[in-house]
Amino acid sequence: MLAWYRAHRTPELTRVAEALAVIGGVQVLPLITLAIVAGLYRAGARAHALFLALAVGGATLLNVVTKLIFQRPRPDVLEAVLREPGFSFPSGHAMANAAFGIAITLIFWRSRAGWPVAVLGAVWAVLVGVSRNYLGVHYPSDVLAGALSSLVWVVGLYLLMGQFRPSLRGSPAGERDNR
């Protein structure tokens, strides 16, 4: 699969993939997350703010620990567009951005923005994951493991927090889901 991406690289797609790497990386995604957390908190949706912070922060911590356990080397750096430090498995970009996308989907699902946010969250997570393979810095299994780990983490966190903070099941605007 990495060979297919390598064979189909173009300057335009490479610029897009590099932009996704920056926006979804450790310097920008935390700022986006913090801005949304602050907005939710100011709007009185404190359970939602806490959930988003724990979802993305917890996925990041889980990623660091998992990388230290597996210590999988990255794909051949001579074939990669970017040089990334550290281990490959699981993809930190895929994990953090999947956690972000899943969390904002769960937060806004019951609001008017539900479907658009769900679609944007899913598309964003997929694009960041694909970009990691396109850039040659991760194997497909790294990206898949990162996304699936975040799915389990974020949904598990949502179910657990929903038991102790029932307001999390409603929209940030205060509507409640009684299903």
Predicted regions and their residues:
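Membrane-interface helix caps of multi-pass small-molecule transporters
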Residues: 4, 64-65, 159
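Membrane-embedded catalytic cores of phosphoryl/pyrophosphoryl-handling enzymes
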Residues: 79-179
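Alpha-helical transmembrane segments of multi-pass membrane proteins, especially transporters
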Residues: 3, 51-56, 124, 146-147
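N-terminal transmembrane-helix/juxtamembrane module of multi-pass inner/ER membrane proteins
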Residues: 1-28, 68-81
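Membrane-interface loops
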Residues: 31-33, 40-115
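Surface-exposed charged/polar residues within alpha-helices that form helix-capping/stabilizing sites
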Residues: 3, 22, 39-40, 106
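Hydrophobic alpha-helical transmembrane segments of polytopic
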Residues: 25, 29-36, 56, 117, ...
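Generic hydrophobic alpha-helical segments
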Residues: 37-38, 130
